[in-house]
Amino acid sequence: MFGVLNSDDHRAAIQQRNILAFGRTSSELWTSNPTSNYWCETRGNGRDSGQNRVRRPMNAFMVWSRDQRRKVALENPQMQNSEISKQLGYQWKMLTEAEKWPFFEEAQRLQAMHREKYPDYKYRPRRKALPQKSDKFLPAASSTLLCRQVLVDKWYPFTYRDSCSRATHSHMEDQLSSSQPVNIANSLLQQEHHYSSTSLRGSPETLATHLSADPPFYPK
């Protein structure tokens, strides 16, 4: 009985070990894309699925800065990578054409090897993440006050002289301050229509009084 149990445990342990070993090993896949037929290695998790990116060949500056970056990083371990790049860019600009020429030759050699190894290679830049909008909106109280002032100035641009007009204006301000921003426009339209129709139904004497409230303006 113990021999049967030991054999079963041994068989299960072997299967588990094989599964783990299969997950760790990398499988070589031949890509089906005719524009990039080259061997690539992918992990057992299958995330890459044979879509490993081919790096661009280095240019002259990259060839020169490959060793220089390591040297600057060793001399200044606290310096950030962005600062190292700025310093290397400045040093590269200070070099003469004769000093740069060996690195241009090396870059041309690397580009020729790259074309020979990947004849159908096409550069495909990665898409940059869209920056988040940093528009700052006004607070609710400030935006409500601003909207109220703009709407009042738009619908009542004339000067109020009689007590009825002042009362209407103060009533409008109270409604604008207490109402929701969504219903402001509808309320103004309804009250403006009601005020206009009421004024038109008045007597000719009332209309004449309102028209003669402001003195006529004569240009000089």
Swiss-Prot record:
Xref: CDD domains: HMG-box_SoxA_SRY
Keyword DNA-binding included in the entry's annotation: yes
One Pfam family cited in the UniProt record for this chain: HMG_box
Gene Ontology MF, one: RNA polymerase II cis-regulatory region sequence-specific DNA binding
Alphabetical list of Gene3D superfamilies matching this protein: High mobility group box domain
Predominant localisation class: nucleus
Superkingdom per UniProt: Eukaryota
Keyword set includes Thylakoid: no
Any one GO CC term of the record: nucleus
Entries under SUPFAM superfamilies matching the protein: HMG-box
Residues within the DNA-binding region(s): 54-122
GO BP: cell differentiation; male sex determination; sex differentiation
Keywords associated with the record: Activator, Calmodulin-binding, Cytoplasm, Differentiation, DNA-binding, Nucleus, Sexual differentiation, Transcription, Transcription regulation
Span list, region Disordered: 193-220
Localisation: Nucleus speckle; Cytoplasm; Nucleus
Subunit structure: Interacts with CALM, EP300, HDAC3, KPNB1, ZNF208 isoform KRAB-O, PARP1, SLC9A3R2 and WT1. The interaction with EP300 modulates its DNA-binding activity. The interaction with KPNB1 is sensitive to dissociation by Ran in the GTP-bound form. Interaction with PARP1 impaired its DNA-binding activity.
Function according to Swiss-Prot or TrEMBL: Transcriptional regulator that controls a genetic switch in male development. It is necessary and sufficient for initiating male sex determination by directing the development of supporting cell precursors (pre-Sertoli cells) as Sertoli rather than granulosa cells. Involved in different aspects of gene regulation including promoter activation or repression. Binds to the DNA consensus sequence 5'-[AT]AACAA[AT]-3'. SRY HMG box recognizes DNA by partial intercalation in the minor groove and promotes DNA bending. Also involved in pre-mRNA splicing.
Family note: Belongs to the SRY family.
Name of the protein in question: Sex-determining region Y protein
Gene name in the database record: SRY
